[in-house]
């Protein structure tokens, strides 16, 4: 849902009617990854490359390169690190959420559904990190301390957290909400932050 929203303003114009409001999944099954790559390759070769436009031939090559890379790296899934101090989940998720534009009222509903899935997503990350630890691949103590500090900094923002203020700003910018609706959505947003997002950060620590 996040990537789609940032890529297409109106996905329905491209025949995409709906997408699940989720961040994605933390994948650890090597065989599942390889099977997924194989299925995508089968779909890709149904297109005759020499009959595509130059632009689409480039897209074809990019997709093929991506699939080749995904297949080669499938056996190294446990070496991934979703909690990096610069581009980790704990630092990037609030930024991505705060920049999620509301073109229609439905976008705010999707956004709130996405926020509600934060707990499940973080639980997947936690399970992944435990798996890394069991395999002797856990991050260094210094990095772990830095991640904990970043999570604490997010929690310490309290009511000053920009996920509160930017939510209201985005509703105003869209011009799609009445004052009454903005009040209702603002309450829902605050509730999700307090009951789902913040507890997820606490568990991550």
Predicted regions and their residues:
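N-terminal maturation segment of proteins
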Residues: 1-205
């Amino acid at each position: 849902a996040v990537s789609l929203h940032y890529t297409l303003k109106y996905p329905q114009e491209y025949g995409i009617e709906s997408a699940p409001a989720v961040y994605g999944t933390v994948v650890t099954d090597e065989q599942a990854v390889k099977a997924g790559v194989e299925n995508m390759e089968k779909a890709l070769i149904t297109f005759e490359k020499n009959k595509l436009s130059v632009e689409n031939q480039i897209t074809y090559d990019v997709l093929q390169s991506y699939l080749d890379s995904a297949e080669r790296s499938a056996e190294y899934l446990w070496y991934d690190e979703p909690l990096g101090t610069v581009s980790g989940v704990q630092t990037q998720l609030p930024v991505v959420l705060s920049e999620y534009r509301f073109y229609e009222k439905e976008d705010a509903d999707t956004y709130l559904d996405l926020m509600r899935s934060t707990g499940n997503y973080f639980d997947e990350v936690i399970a992944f990190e435990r798996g890394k630890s069991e395999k002797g691949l856990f991050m260094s103590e210094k990095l772990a301390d830095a991640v904990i500090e970043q999570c604490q900094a997010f929690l310490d923002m309290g009511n000053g957290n920009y996920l509160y203020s930017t939510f209201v700003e985005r509703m105003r910018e869209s011009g799609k909400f009445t004052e009454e609706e903005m009040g209702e959505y603002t309450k829902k947003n605050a509730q999700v932050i307090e009951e789902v997002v913040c507890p997820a950060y606490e568990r991550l620590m």
